[in-house]
Amino acid sequence: MSEYKDTLNLPETGFPMRGDLAKREPEMLKRWYQEDLYGEIRKAKKGKKSFVLHDGPPYANGDIHIGHALNKILKDIIIKSKTLSGFDAPYVPGWDCHGLPIELMVEKKVGKPGQKVTAAEFREKCREYAAGQVEGQKESFKRLGIMGEWDKPYRTMDFTTEANIIRALGQIADNGHLLKGFKPVHWCTDCGSALAEAEVEYKNKVSPSIDVRFKAADEAALLAKFSLNEGHQGQGDVSIVIWTTTPWTLPANRAVCLRDDLEYVLIQVEGDNPERIIVAAELAKDVMDRAGIEHFHNLGFAKGADLELTQFQHPFYDFTVPAILGDHVTTDSGTGVVHTAPGHGQEDFAVGQKYNLEVANPVGSNGVYLPDTELFAGQHVFKANDAVVETLKEKGALLHHHAYEHSYPHCWRHKTPIIFRATPQWFVSMDQAGLRAKALESIKGVQWMPEWGQSRIEGMIEGRPEWCISRQRTWGVPIALFVHKETAELHPNTSELIEKVAQVVEQKGIQAWWDIDAAELLGDDAAQYEKVLDTLDVWFDSGVTHYAVVDKREEFNGAEADMYLEGSDQHRGWFQSSLISSIAMKGKAPYKQVLTHGFVVDGHGRKMSKSIGNVVAPKDVTNKLGADILRLWVASTDYTGEVAVSDEILKRSADAYRRIRNTARFFLANLNGFNPETDIVPVEEMVALDRWAVGRALAAQNEIVKAYDEYNTHAVTQRLMHFCSIEMGSFYLDVIKDRQYTAKLGGHAQRSCQTALYYIVEALVRWMAPIMSFTADEIWNQMPASLPSGESRDKFVFTGEWFDGLFGLAEGEELNNAFWSEMQKVRGAVNKLLEAARSDKTIGGSLQAELTLFADDALAAKINKLEDELRFVLLTSAATVKPLSEKSDAAQATDIEGLFVAVRATEAEKCDRCWHHTPDVGTIEGHEKICGRCVSNVDGEGEARKFA
C-alpha cells in the first residue's frame, strides 16, 4: 500500500475535528474586532434596503442571565440572516439606565440622597454605577458572538438620549395626551413611589376576608324600596353587607356600590339576636353558609337601581355613605355589594368621580396612616388589618372573618405587597384625546408572531388605566414642566420651554434640570410657576426610544423599526409603552412586526432558581462548551413557548454540533488540491450523483432561507441536520469516498466530485453563519482562497449573501430526484443484509461482499441505469441485477417489494490501493497488487464515471 499512498487523494485540512470552542472563540473574537468585522458588514451593505430590529434595552444591573442570552442570540441570528439576504441591517444595542434598582444599589454604598451625599452627587454615583454595569454586560454579549455597535450603543442615560426623552414628553403634551390627576396608583411603600403596570407582579398572599355590616341610616326609607312579602318588615337592625380582603382601606370608605340590574334580597336572620341584612340574591346562600347562619328567610327583594343614594352608616366613623351603582360589581364572589374607597382603587376612583365622592387618602408614602387618621394613626396599613377587624367586632359590624389566600399585586423589586394610593401624579391619558382607540386600531396593522400576541395586547390596551408616568425618585429623567402655583396649569409656553431644557440637558445631562433657576427660563413668570420635581417612569424612557434612538441615530437612515423582539412578558411592558407613546407622538405604531419568545425553564419545566440549583449561566456554558453550542441550542428550540435548558439538553446540542462540524470538515478535507479558478467541472459534464448532490443543496437552501425569513430557526437547524446527516453523511459522502480518494488525481471523476463539494460548502457555510457564527468563520478561512472568477474571497462570510452558484437537476434528467431517492431505499435494504452477513461472519467489511439483486422488471430497469457503477453506490466489490424470476435459494427478502438479494463472500483478491476485490488483481504486469481500475487511475487517463 505504501508505494501507492502518494497516488491517493487523501483528505487533508487545517480545520480540526475538535472544535475546542471555549479556547478558539475568544481568539476569533479578537480578530473580528481588530479587523472591524461589524464595520466591514456596514460598508458592504451600505445603500441596500434596510431592516431595522430595534433592541429592547436590558436593565443595567447585574450579570446577564440565560434569558438575556436567548434574546440577544435570537436577535443576532435574525440580523445576520437578513444581512445574508441582502439587507442593510444595523444593530444598535441599548441599555435601560435609570430607575430604582440602580438607586438601591447605590444607596447601599453611599446612603440615601440628602443624608451623606447630595441629590446631585447621588445621581452622579448612579451614572457611574450604571456605566460599569453596561460595560460588564457588553463584554458578556460580545462573547456570545453578537455583532453590533458595541462602541456606540444607546444608553437611556446618555445626555442626548435624556434630552430626546424630554422632547418626547413635550410632544405628548403638545398632542393633548398629558394630564395631571389625583388618582389611585400602584404604590410600593418600600420604594416610596408609584409603580408602572409592568413593575407589578402577582403572587399569592393570605389576607383577612371579612363581611362587614353597614347599618341603614333611615330604616323606614330603605324598607320602602323593597317589595316585601305580605308586608312583613321583619325585626332587628337593617344592614347592607360588603365583603373585602383589605380591611385597612375601610377608613377611606366613602360608599357601598351595587349593580343596577342585580336583584338584592332583604333577609331576616332568625334566633335570639334577630337582624335583617341585604345582599345580592344569588349570593345569599353563600353568605349565610360563610357566616354560619342556618335559620333565616327572605322578606323581600329590590333592584340595585332602586337602592341608589340610600344612606348607610360607616361601620366605625360618625358619618354616612351612599349606595351607588357601578358596572364593576359582579356575583363571582363576595356579597354583590362592593366597599368603595376612591383613594385606594382604580374602579372605586372611577365610580366615585361619577358621584363626586371624596378621594380620601389617609395613608402616607411609607404605608403608615397619617397622624389625623382616627383610631389608626401611625400604624402600617398591613399591620393595621387586625386592628380594623377588632374595631369592627367592638362596633358589632363584623358579620364574618376568615383567612383567605388569593393573588395579590407585589413590587417586582422588593417582592412585597403593594397598595393602591391616591396621589397627585402625571398621566398619559388613554381616553381624553382618543389614544386608546387609536392604539387598538394600530395593533391590527402590526404582524404579531405568534398570532396570539395580538389578542393579548389588545386585551391589555382595552383594560389598562391611564399610564402613570411620574415617579418620586432621584435617578431618572425629570418631568421638565413648569406648573402654576395656584391653578396647577402648565405654563402656556411649555413647548418652547421643553426644547430649551432639552438643549441644556443635551450638554450637561439631567442634573441640569435641578440646577437650573426658573428665572433663567421664565423671567418674570418665575414667581408664579414652580418646577415639577418628579422623574419619569423608566418604561417611558425605553418606551420612547422609537423616537429618541431609532429616529435620531444615523445608522438607521431615518428608517422606522421593522421589528421588536422580546420575551412574551413585554406585551405588558415595552411593547405596550412603545405603542402608547408612539401613537401619542406620531399617530402610528412604532413597529411593523413584533416577535416574542418564551421564558427559559429547566429540563423539568421549572423556572430558573438559585434555591433549586437549576440556574444555567451563559458564562459557564461558553467557558465549558463554547458560544456556538449555546447559539445552536437557541436556534434549535421552538422559542414561541417555554424554552428548556439543562446540561443534558446542551449535551444534545453539542452532539448535533459535532455532526455538522464533521460534515463541514469532510468537505474541506476533500477540497485538498482544488482550485475553483481552474478546476471547476461544467455542470453538464459532472457525474450524475454530483449534480444530484448540488441539487439537494439548492433544495435545502430554498427551505433554509425561507425558514430564516419566517424567523423559524428551529426549522433551519432541523433542515441543516437532515442535510448533513441524511442526504450527505448517510448517502452522498459515503458513496463518493471511493471515487474521491482513489480516482486519478486531478482527473474528471475526482474534479467532478470536488466541484460538487465546493459548491455545497459555499452554501453550507452561509447557512451556518447566522447560528454557528464562530464555526462558519473558521470554515470560511479554510476554504479555497480564490473564487471561480479569479477574485479573492471576502475576508468574512458575514459580508456576503446566500450562495447563488447552486443548481438543480435539469428538466428531463433521467437520474432525477425520484431515482436517487429509490436508490437510497435500495441501498438501505441492502445494508441491512450486509450487516447481518457481517454479524454471522460471512463477510468482514462490505467490500468483501458480492451481491446479486433479483428485482421485478420495473425496479430492475431503474437499478440497471447505474450499469457497472451500482457497486459503488452499494459499497460492495461486485453487484449484478437479475430478473426476479431467476431468484436463487440464497436470496433473501428485503423491505422493498419486488427485491430479493443474495450476499456471498467474494473469492477475488483485494486491491492494495482501493481495497475492492476484483478478478483482475494480480493480472497486470508491474502492478500485481492493484486492480485494473487503479492502474488506470495511477498510470493511465483515469477511470470514467458517469453515474456515481
Swiss-Prot record:
GO MF, any single term: ATP binding
EC nos: 6.1.1.5
Broad EC category: ligase
Keyword presence, Phosphoprotein: no
Chain positions of motif 'KMSKS' region: 607-611
Required co-factors: Zn(2+)
Source superkingdom: Bacteria
Co-factor remark: Binds 1 zinc ion per subunit.
Residue numbers binding Zn(2+): 911, 914, 931, 934
Annotated binding of ATP, by residue: 610
Record-listed L-isoleucyl-5'-AMP binding positions: 566
Keyword Repeat: no
One GO-annotated biological process of the protein: isoleucyl-tRNA aminoacylation
UniProt motif 'HIGH' region: location: 58-68
Subcellular location: Cytoplasm
Main location: cytoplasm
GO CC entries: cytosol
Alphabetical keyword list: Aminoacyl-tRNA synthetase, ATP-binding, Cytoplasm, Ligase, Metal-binding, Nucleotide-binding, Protein biosynthesis, Zinc
PROSITE patterns: AA_TRNA_LIGASE_I
HAMAP family: Ile_tRNA_synth_type1
Subunit record text: Monomer.
Similarity field: Belongs to the class-I aminoacyl-tRNA synthetase family. IleS type 1 subfamily.
Notes on the domains: IleRS has two distinct active sites: one for aminoacylation and one for editing. The misactivated valine is translocated from the active site to the editing site, which sterically excludes the correctly activated isoleucine. The single editing site contains two valyl binding pockets, one specific for each substrate (Val-AMP or Val-tRNA(Ile)).
Protein name: Isoleucine--tRNA ligase
Organism in which the protein naturally occurs: Vibrio vulnificus (strain CMCP6)
